[in-house]
Amino acid sequence: MIKRSRANRTERATFRNIRNEHKFIDVVHHGDGHYYMIQYIKHELPERTVVNYMGTRCGHKQKFRIGKATLMGILEDYKKVEEV
């Protein structure tokens, strides 16, 4: 995890899929023992950027609450994206 909040408890990082360059995961850790993951597809077009969240219900993005072991298994297919 890279970016920490002012309270120094929340960590946030973004990862890109190795095989699909348009697939991303945002991982947030609040220090409560669980990780929260939002998965999305991002397409950069000349006129706009399109973001489609996966696992949505009624068009709202959904956070998945997972443990560290599960997260490490998922992140084997992902590479960390450096934030600007």
Task: Describe the residue ranges of each PLM region.
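Mixed-charge, Lys/Arg-rich low-complexity intrinsically disordered regions
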Residues: 2-21
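Acidic, low-complexity, intrinsically disordered interaction modules
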Residues: 21-73
